[in-house]
Design a protein with these regions (language model features):
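Extended alpha-helical targeting/anchoring segments
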Residues: 1-188
Length: 188
């Protein structure tokens, strides 16, 4: 988690690097929030909640194409925690990780992003926007948040460098990089 030094009215969070996996939580059963609560055990957990979990909490459903194939919920308990506070680093670990950090080699691979594909074409997008604009004009709503997914392939991906580049382009107070098996979440 990285705050990029951006102040936030409610303090935000420390910059934290969570490394390694002691335990992973990725359930398939229906009562996932209760299972997550039992898994927590007052330990540090990092992860995410997917958009479609709304269907578990309310009588809602969506039939969106899933191009990323992430589980709807996943959390892990890290082996090592590194807290960055100004010019200091505090390490919480059950083992000495400094030697491992010193031996780590940098990956200097440059990523090549192929042309991303929109989940809907331009004509459909314009049609949806016109319908949403009409709802606003009719007074049905005063604000609408419309999103569309873009997906694509990245060759020779260096996800850490890509995250760093995105973060430099658009720093935010709640930036995050997460690896989930062979998938990555870059939230910058």
């Amino acid at each position: 988690f990285q705050s990029n030094g951006i102040s936030y009215p409610y303090q935000g969070f420390d910059e934290i690097l969570a490394v390694g996996v002691k335990r992973i939580f990725s359930p398939n059963e229906k009562d996932r929030f209760e299972a997550l609560s039992a898994f927590h055990q007052n330990k540090w957990l990092f992860g995410y909640l997917g958009y479609d979990l709304k269907n578990d909490t309310e009588k809602l459903s969506s039939n969106n194409a899933d191009h990323v194939l992430f589980p709807e919920i996943s959390f892990f308990e890290p082996q090592h925690l590194l807290f960055f506070k100004g010019n200091e680093i505090e390490i919480w670990s059950e083992e000495d990780v400094l030697e491992q950090i010193d031996k780590t080699e940098s990956d200097l691979t440059q990523s090549k992003l192929n042309q991303p594909q929109a989940s809907i074409n331009k004509a459909e997008y314009i049609g949806i926007i016109e319908k949403l604009r009409q709802h606003i004009e009719d007074g049905d709503c005063y604000e609408i948040n419309f999103c569309q997914e873009f997906h694509g392939e990245i060759e020779n991906v260096n996800p850490i460098q890509l995250y760093s580049d995105l973060n430099k382009l658009s720093p935010s107070p709640f930036s995050c990089f997460q690896k989930h098996h062979e998938h990555y979440i870059l939230s910058a």
